[in-house]
Amino acid sequence: MGRIAIYVVALIFGFANVTARADEKKYGPGVTDTEIKIGNSIPYSGPASSFGTTGRAQAAYYRMVNDSGGVNGRKITLVSLDDGYSPPKAAENARRLVEQDEVLGIFGSLGTPANVAMQRYLNDRKVPQLFVFSGVARFRNPRTYPWTMGGDLAFVSETEAFARYILATQAAPKIGVLYQNDDFGKDHLTGLRQGLGANAAAIVKTASYEPTDATVDSQIIELERSGANVVLIVAIPKFAAQAIRKIHDIGWNPLKLLAYPGATIPGTLKPAGLEASVGVVTAEFVKVTGDPAWANDPEMLAFHNFIKSYAPDLDPNDKLTVFGYYNAAMVVALLKRCGDNLTRENVLDQATHLKNVSIPMLLPGITLNTTPDDYSAIKQMQLQRFDGTGWVLIGSIVGG
């Protein structure tokens, strides 16, 4: 009987140890009982400096979360570095964030060239590169880059929707395309061709530019001379503004479609001229600030309270502010799901198992959904048209 009693005690003790181990906290780099350190790379300077608004909005959102107790009792520390929209600088930033700052992961970095420059290094080191501000396909390719996931709408999906809109509204479309000469521009071209299908010959002229170019005036003149009556502008705000202004100045009046990364009123349409921008059509997946339809919406009211308390220097009517806000909210939602298992492996596992996750400021009906084989978290959008003062939604939610 003595041996049996000893065995039972040992068995109970063993189960207690298993339970204790199951409850143990698991931390990756940058995590303690009181802190979660994360990083990103943002173009606060250079040709895409207007995108710096997203980084400032993210930082402000994390301050708000920290003031409310943080995530599961831990405060978020964001190390946000300027890359000037330069791929070599972005690659340097990634190494610093991982090797010197020892962050848990890279969240909400902006720009296709910068994220491409960081991608292989981060995947080789098995560091999460999540909720990237870019819709290119290579950030939605789990087989090749399992540690990278986009955080907004796929560019191919946007221009497939544009193609359907063109075919529905233009009797005999002749399409000219201005695009940035990288994956950002080329993915949009791919989506346009796929969406047009048998009508792909309607693309009569394409013209590319480099982010280091001074202007895109000559490209716009080329497109106008092609006889195009539709123009798709796939450009960052600086060059999108130049394109819209030049179209207006030469008296050209095509249907103007603008890829959503450049569709910001303060960064693109105001510099181009609001009158020149009337009629511009883009895709959207977040609520439009200033739209009376959302005046009493709880999420919109919370957003404006956030601006007042934590980001008074940011323009609430700039969708880049909204982008930074919703992206940081995605990160916080993900970290909450991780509980006390804040390893890089679990962060990735949680990110690839999102189902109908609601995030503030996304349009009604749009939720986050991912699987280990599907890294496109946002799959739906709604088209909208600029009326001279703000955006007016067109039709209903599309995609899925």
Would you name each region that the model predicts?
Residues D23-K26, E35-K37, S50-R56, D67-N141, ...:
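Beta-alpha junction/loop-to-helix N-cap segments that form part of ligand/metal-binding clefts
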Residues P88-E92, A137-R140, Y145-I250, A293-N296, ...:
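Extracellular/periplasmic Venus flytrap/periplasmic-binding protein
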Residues K26-A59, L81-P88, L110-G111, L178-K186, ...:
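Extracytoplasmic "Venus flytrap"
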